């Protein structure tokens, strides 16, 4: 069963640096079983990154959390790991209504 999570974390090297790291980790994310549905910084604070992540399963979410190499890659990209908060979303949600908005 898929799990959707809202993530909030501080980034110290800017969104574009973070985005380059994410693009370079496409294979790792597929291996773990995760998909980034949304990510962006808040207008008031460009160091506050908000993300919506879909994990294929509880095991995929656990694999993400325990992957030391991926954690270090994210840390090197400016993610302040100690500031991270992940909040599971309930099974009641709506996406892409009335149509998807996509920007890379």
Question: Where is each model-derived feature located?
Answer:
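Short S/T/G/P-rich N-terminal loop/turn motif that feeds into the first structured element of a domain
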Residues: 1-71, 76, 80-104
């Amino acid at each position: 069963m898929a799990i959707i999570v809202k993530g909030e974390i501080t980034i110290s090297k800017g969104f574009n640096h973070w985005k380059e790291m994410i693009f370079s980790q496409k294979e790792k994310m597929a291996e773990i079983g995760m998909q980034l549905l949304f990510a962006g910084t808040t207008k008031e604070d460009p160091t506050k990154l908000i993300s919506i992540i879909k994990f294929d399963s509880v095991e995929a979410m656990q694999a993400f959390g325990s992957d030391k190499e991926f954690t270090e890659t994210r840390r090197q990209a400016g993610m302040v790991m100690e500031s991270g908060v992940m909040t599971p979303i309930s099974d009641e949600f709506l996406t892409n209504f009335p149509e998807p908005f996509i920007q890379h």
